[in-house]
Amino acid sequence: NRYEYYDVRFDEENDEKFTLIQRLRPAVQANEFEVYYQPLINLASNKVQAVEALLRWPQKDGSMIFPDKFIPLAESSGLIIPLGAWVLNQACEFCAKQHENGHTNLTVAVNLSFAQFKDGTLPAVVEQALQNSQLAPQFLELELTETILADENGTTGEQLEAIKSLGVHFAIDDFGTGYSNLNYLQTFSARKLKIDRIFINTLGIGENDGPLVAAIISIADSLGMKAVAEGIESKPV
């Protein structure tokens, strides 16, 4: 014999997920999403060197659904494949247009999901996006989580090598929150190392965060990588 507690919030969460996934497929088919571009600024020159593509799902009432709500559903349903391809095409086209407007050194960064590697078509998708936009591959940067780099059972490594052979660059995203395996930095030639905002937001508060950030930057420098600090939103930081 046993008893369980019932919480109406469980039903509310499940209802919300069910409603979203029912709306997600037609939204993907109709390209109802928008891509915003967050600038990455060189602190030495105070100039924009790159932009990061951020996906949003606008609603008819003017509100916005953020990725943490719909990306997990897209991953579990397989819709991340067409959605991810659409984002890549949008980002490459945006960057190519910026080059035409005189911003010839601008790079665009796009986040990748581990689920995008599952069907083995990602290298072809990346190549097609570059061809469609006529963007030179060195101006596309794909951001990889440590979960992607840790995959040893699938074809992820082969696909990454195929993409790298196109001339596309990589960045390691959210460094310090996953496996943080230094071996990845030695064996995988990424151009950038992105320090997770959890370390940046507490600079000046937590006594260990400053030395940790400095150590990560030093590692990146020694390996010829650029360090990117996420979440800098004030002058003291």
Regions found by a protein language model. Name each.
Residues 1-8:
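Short, structured interface segments
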